Amino acid sequence: MSGESSSGSTEHCIKVVPTHGGRYVQYNVYGQLFEVSRKYVPPIRPIGRGACGIVCAAVNSVTGEKVAIKKIGNAFDNIIDAKRTLREIKLLRHMDHENVITIKDIVRPPQRDIFNDVYIVYELMDTDLQRILRSNQTLTSDQCRFLVYQLLRGLKYVHSANILHRDLRPSNVLLNSKNELKIGDFGLARTTSDTDFMTEYVVTRWYRAPELLLNCSEYTAAIDIWSVGCILGEIMTGQPLFPGKDYVHQLRLITELVGSPDNSSLGFLRSDNARRYVRQLPRYPKQQFAARFPKMPTTAIDLLERMLVFDPNRRISVDEALGHAYLSPHHDVAKEPVCSTPFSFDFEHPSCTEEHIKELIYKESVKFNPDH
């Protein structure tokens, strides 16, 4: 190593240390080392921290593009986290849509055999919907409509690739200053139902469909539509619709609004125990949505009612939602593309080891950086 310089604002004075003969640079961000290709230059700005790691904004000196770099530290310490990282990389490389976040690069590790951290480079967005909602910014009726339209437009493409997002929530809905929306965080995505979903992560339950709360192993794209309904209600009211403290409370909040399901609405539950459990819950009539959401446009209320249906088989589909009257100012089927080829999760073998995943991620980084 040789030479040091400083970058960043007065708030974050971040030292730059060249490594590996100057091919890489190292930054100390929040006490964590951040080592990336030298093309990523200051200003380096921390923009987020989460369970998966730290995210910094930087500039690609080759293209001049502003990017977001996510460091996933100790990415191969356990198989679940390793699979999640590989899954997101492969999914985002497969997809190409205006309303889905773009992966720009995987920083190629300096040494093939000795690396534990993964750096994923995305296009930089200005904020996310959760931050907007928490800041008490008032979204206009037109802004709300455009956000919901873009979310559904992106979701149509995702579903056409045979992918279920499974974790749509405001913090995964990314925005820029032009009010353009992109869906992010595909780490929990799947093509089909997976029993390991329930144990894999504690997903924010506020946006989870009833069939997931009830441990239903056979679920469909309708789970994402439920989440969009929760988001629609929240951007219209400024408050989460179902801020459950636990699973029981979550189900109660849902049934208090949409009404307790009758027997004909429980066909999606294969388990007798699950059906018995739902039947013994306190009974609630469906609320009048117009009374509950007095400031929402009538057409928005109608769309919300069609999304927040307890029985997933009766929930509106993404294509039907895009064609709904509420979204008619934006809807144009010719400008709502689908994915040309379905995504395959064949790389996820049950016998897959951390070392195998490490090798696959290395190969992904080489695809971005063949002349390293």
Swiss-Prot record:
| SS bond partners | none
Q: Which Pfam families match?
A: Pkinase
Q: Give the main localization category.
A: nucleus
Which species does this protein come from?
Arabidopsis thaliana
Site (Involved in HT1 binding) at: G53
Identify the GO cellular component terms for this protein: nucleus; plasma membrane
List modified residues, type Phosphotyrosine. Answer: Y201
Which residues hold ATP?
Answer: I47, G48, R49, G50, A51, C52, G53, I54, V55, K70
Disrupted-gene phenotype: Lethal in homozygous plants. Abolished CO(2)-mediated stomatal closure. Increased stomatal opening.
Q: What is this protein called?
A: Mitogen-activated protein kinase 12
Topology relative to the membrane = Peripheral membrane protein
* Residues covered by the Protein kinase domain: 41-327
Q: What does this protein do?
A: Negative regulator of the auxin transduction signaling pathway. Involved in stomatal movement regulation by phosphorylating and repressing HT1 and HT1-mediated GHR1 phosphorylation. Required for CO(2)-mediated stomatal movements (e.g. closure).
